[in-house]
Structure formats: structure tokens, C-alpha cells
């Protein structure tokens, strides 16, 4: 007896979903133009010759602000469905959301006290 009997259609879907991108990329590689030259591999800067290095070092503070932004952006993504279905979920879900928010607020206070949000 096959245990996963009800999942036959899902297996077919999974195989097709994996094959479509592979076939599309293979077909595009077969029909693409095969010419190129040194101009093709140069960096394009608004139609003029590139000046200087292509790599630029960014200040680490940009990364800290980006990291804090991503954390609180993900928080918003998690809190929106909770806020929409708050009336049906009850008091336990409210406590879970408070725990989630308090963990994030503790992290924000920690980053603030460590000076991660200072721009000096």
C-alpha cells in the first residue's frame, strides 16, 4: 500500500514546476545570439566611458540602518494579518502579539543604547 497515494497530483505539479524554468532557460540559451565582443563586457555608465573603479565602499552605518529597517519591515508583515483577524482570535493571540512586540522593542532599545542608530 502506497502511503502517499493522495499526493500523486502534487508530485506531478512539483515535477512540472521544476521543469518549466529549466526548459525556459535552456530554450533561451539555444535561441540567443552568439556574438559578442569586448564592448559587450564593459561597464555601461550613461553612454560614457567608465571612470574609476566599479566597486565603492559603503559606510557600515548604512548596513546597520538597513538591517534595522528590514527587521521592522518584517514585523509589519507579521502584524498586519494579526491586526486584520484580531476580533476572531481572542485574548491569547493578543498576548502573543505583545510578547512579539516586546522582543522587538527590547532589540530596538539595545541597538539604540549601543549607538547603532547614531550618525556621528
UniProtKB/Swiss-Prot annotation:
It is a multi-pass membrane protein. It is found in: Plastid, Chloroplast thylakoid membrane. The keyword Oxidoreductase does not apply. GO terms for molecular function: NADH dehydrogenase (ubiquinone) activity; quinone binding. Keywords: Chloroplast, Membrane, NAD, NADP, Plastid, Plastoquinone, Quinone, Thylakoid, Translocase, Transmembrane, Transmembrane helix, Transport. Its EC number is 7.1.1.-. It comes from the Eukaryota. Pfam families: Oxidored_q4 (PF00507). Its main location: plastid. NDH shuttles electrons from NAD(P)H:plastoquinone, via FMN and iron-sulfur (Fe-S) centers, to quinones in the photosynthetic chain and possibly in a chloroplast respiratory chain. The immediate electron acceptor for the enzyme in this species is believed to be plastoquinone. Couples the redox reaction to proton translocation, and thus conserves the redox energy in a proton gradient. HAMAP family: NDH1_NuoA. NDH is composed of at least 16 different subunits, 5 of which are encoded in the nucleus. This is NAD(P)H-quinone oxidoreductase subunit 3, chloroplastic. It comes from Chlorokybus atmophyticus (Soil alga). The lineage of its organism: Eukaryota, Viridiplantae, Streptophyta, Chlorokybophyceae, Chlorokybales.
Amino acid at each position: 500500500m502506497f502511503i502517499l497515494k493522495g499526493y500523486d497530483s502534487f508530485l506531478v505539479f512539483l515535477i512540472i514546476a521544476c521543469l518549466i524554468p529549466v526548459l525556459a532557460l535552456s530554450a533561451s540559451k539555444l535561441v540567443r545570439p552568439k556574438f559578442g565582443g569586448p564592448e559587450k563586457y564593459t561597464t555601461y555608465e550613461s553612454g560614457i566611458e567608465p571612470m574609476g573603479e566599479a566597486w565603492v565602499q559603503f559606510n557600515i552605518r548604512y548596513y546597520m540602518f538597513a538591517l534595522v529597517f528590514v527587521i521592522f519591515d518584517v514585523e509589519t508583515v507579521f502584524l498586519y494579518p494579526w491586526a486584520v483577524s484580531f476580533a476572531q482570535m481572542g485574548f491569547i493571540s493578543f498576548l502573543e502579539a505583545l510578547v512579539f512586540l516586546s522582543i522587538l522593542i527590547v532589540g530596538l532599545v539595545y541597538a539604540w543604547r549601543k549607538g547603532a542608530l547614531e550618525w556621528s
